[in-house]
């Protein structure tokens, strides 16, 4: 039986659950919400299964860091040229010949994270391969998971997973994903549709709507963060995504955050990855 953990009971005050508009009332309403898991994902399935990657190039960048190697990755997929940023540990940061690799996906209205930010993964002994695609906004996702912009990005993410497994020095059995907002939605979809499944997935305030249709397909463990003040990714819809998962899962709910980066959750993500791959934590 899969393991399910959440801090929801810590946030609900029984005496306030019947008062409309309170955190306790909202969470009582959200607790068992499963949404509408009937979205048509046939186009996503087709796109994610047709992964003929061509012309893969890995171009080294010299940042003179003795503990990390940096490269720009590109390949062709279905008429598109997909770009990514690759960082892998080296020197004293490399714990083994084959290392785990994090697939990283960014949110709407934001570009790929910088090299400096992502170097943290190398310091922990992980490689990271981040999708470097054009920035889109919420208006591009109005059709939920059937939105062309989302359907376009999911096979890019699945192709990155395929590429990652074949890179020298990467452990094909320890590929995992992390994303916020749109990136969280892409990470979840890749975990659900990737032919081998991912070792684990972390996501915060995932979007677009309709992701609960993919939840039952996710393999590997999941850590999910939800901000109750989020007006971009509906918190109630996020509960549907979490409640649809059938794998080991943990849900951390934040009452006082909106659609934003949560440093405390990033710490939880690091802890989650370390416990998954190295049996250690920050605690």
Residue positions per predicted region:
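N-terminal cap/lid segment of alpha/beta-hydrolase-fold proteins
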Residues: 52-97
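Short beta-to-alpha linker loops that shape the active-site pocket of alpha/beta-hydrolase fold enzymes
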Residues: 90, 132-137, 207, 257
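C-terminal catalytic histidine-bearing segment of alpha/beta-hydrolase fold enzymes
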Residues: 3-10, 240-283
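Active-site glycine-rich loops that stabilize anionic/oxyanionic intermediates
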Residues: 99, 104-110
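N-terminal targeting or regulatory segments adjacent to alpha/beta-hydrolase or S9 domains
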Residues: 1-69, 124, 282-283
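Cap/lid segment of the alpha/beta-hydrolase catalytic domain
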Residues: 113-155
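Primarily recognizes the serine-hydrolase "nucleophile elbow" in alpha/beta-hydrolase
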Residues: 158-212
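The feature captures the conserved acid-bearing segment of alpha/beta-hydrolase catalytic domains
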Residues: 207-253, 259
